[in-house]
Amino acid sequence: MKNTIVQQQRFLQSIHKPTYLQRPGSFALVYPYYAVMAGLGLYSLYASGRVIFGKKDAF
């Protein structure tokens, strides 16, 4: 079995991106997560505004 640690280290250090975006295909996991978190944050602000103005239901 060949040791490929040095080649992997060279690959990862040559890319100037954050660690969580360096691997191929990682954007398929990271960006949907960002979208869900942004949507939940916006919904939370919307529902908080509704409660502040006296409307108990979010819809």
Swiss-Prot record:
Pfam families, sorted: COX7a (PF02238)
Transmembrane segments: 25-47
One GO CC term on file: mitochondrial inner membrane
Protein name as annotated: Cytochrome c oxidase subunit 7
Membrane topology designation: Single-pass membrane protein
Mitochondrial intermembrane compartment spans: 48-59
GO MF term list: oxidoreductase activity
Record's subcellular location: Mitochondrion inner membrane
Domain of life: Eukaryota
Alphabetical list of InterPro entries matching this protein: COX7a
Family to which the UniProt record says this protein belongs: Belongs to the cytochrome c oxidase subunit 7 family.
Quaternary structure (record): Component of the cytochrome c oxidase (complex IV, CIV), a multisubunit enzyme composed of a catalytic core of 3 subunits and several supernumerary subunits. The complex exists as a monomer or a dimer and forms supercomplexes (SCs) in the inner mitochondrial membrane with ubiquinol-cytochrome c oxidoreductase (cytochrome b-c1 complex, complex III, CIII).
Function: Component of the cytochrome c oxidase, the last enzyme in the mitochondrial electron transport chain which drives oxidative phosphorylation. The respiratory chain contains 3 multisubunit complexes succinate dehydrogenase (complex II, CII), ubiquinol-cytochrome c oxidoreductase (cytochrome b-c1 complex, complex III, CIII) and cytochrome c oxidase (complex IV, CIV), that cooperate to transfer electrons derived from NADH and succinate to molecular oxygen, creating an electrochemical gradient over the inner membrane that drives transmembrane transport and the ATP synthase.
Mitochondrial matrix topological segments: 1-24
Organism of this sequence: Schizosaccharomyces pombe (strain 972 / ATCC 24843) (Fission yeast)
Listed pathway(s): Energy metabolism; oxidative phosphorylation
GO biological process, one term: mitochondrial electron transport, cytochrome c to oxygen
Keywords noted in UniProt: Membrane, Mitochondrion, Mitochondrion inner membrane, Oxidoreductase, Transmembrane, Transmembrane helix
